Design a protein with these regions (language model features):
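Membrane-helix interface segments in multi-pass membrane proteins
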Residues: 38-68, 114-151, 188-206
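N-terminal juxtamembrane cytosolic/stromal segments of multi-pass membrane proteins
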Residues: 1-51
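Interfacial loop-to-transmembrane junctions
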Residues: 163-186
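Hydrophobic alpha-helical segments of integral membrane proteins
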Residues: 1-18, 66, 79, 83, ...
Length: 206
């Protein structure tokens, strides 16, 4: 069984296979590959890496993606396990790590889009857009194509993770989705508080 392909047609069977036959190391490998794939577009249109060569941009992008995604991976597994148990679930952290990895499998297939964008736009892809209302250096068609694909894959990944959380905790996918939303709410509130504290500290110092 190839989880990278089967996830598209039989997501629940793929998740069950990962739980029964794979280790956390395998899940970590998936997360690393996914981070490298998504890292290509992480700094697109930001202007943060202007002046760097393409190899340096790739190295920084991949490094940043790994530094963010790997800790977030393990933290998400812990939080989904904890929140799920509060909602009546019976899952464990190991199985949660594997279904989260299963949920990001579709995102790996964004790699060809990232490579194509680099081939077409080169270093300009990572420059800040010029113009008051400019949002991207990509053509409108390519930008819309990329946005639609990313939106669709993100929704599909959320559906898979909802099913996976439900599978691990022995409850419905809807409750699994609720687990995701509760965690997202916690992250949002904590981020908002951190922003308020940071801004308040800066204003106080001024």
């Amino acid at each position: 069984m190839n989880p990278f392909l089967l996830i598209w047609t039989q997501p629940k069977k793929t998740l069950a296979y990962l739980i029964e036959h794979k280790t956390i190391g395998y899940g970590l490998m998936i997360m690393v590959i996914s981070s490298l794939c998504s890292g290509i577009m992480a700094f697109a249109d930001t202007g943060l890496l202007e002046g760097f060569s393409l190899p340096a941009i790739f190295a920084i992008s991949f490094g940043a993606a790994l530094l963010i995604s790997i800790p977030a991976y393990f933290m998400s597994a812990f939080m989904y396990t904890w929140i799920g148990k509060l909602l009546g679930g019976t899952g464990n952290w190991r199985e949660m790590c594997l279904v989260i990895a299963g949920g990001v499998l579709p995102m790996i297939w964004t790699l060809p889009i990232g490579i194509l964008a680099v081939i077409i736009y080169g270093k300009a892809l990572f420059s800040e857009p010029v113009g008051v209302f400019a949002v991207t250096n990509m053509s409108l068609g390519f930008y819309l194509f990329h946005t639609v694909i990313m939106t669709g894959l993100s929704i599909f990944s959320t559906v898979i993770q909802s099913k996976g959380i439900g599978l691990v905790h022995n409850f419905s996918a809807w409750r699994g989705f609720g687990t995701i939303m509760i965690y997202a709410g916690i992250v949002f509130v904590l981020s908002f508080i951190l922003i308020i504290i940071t801004v308040g500290s800066i204003l106080f110092m001024v």
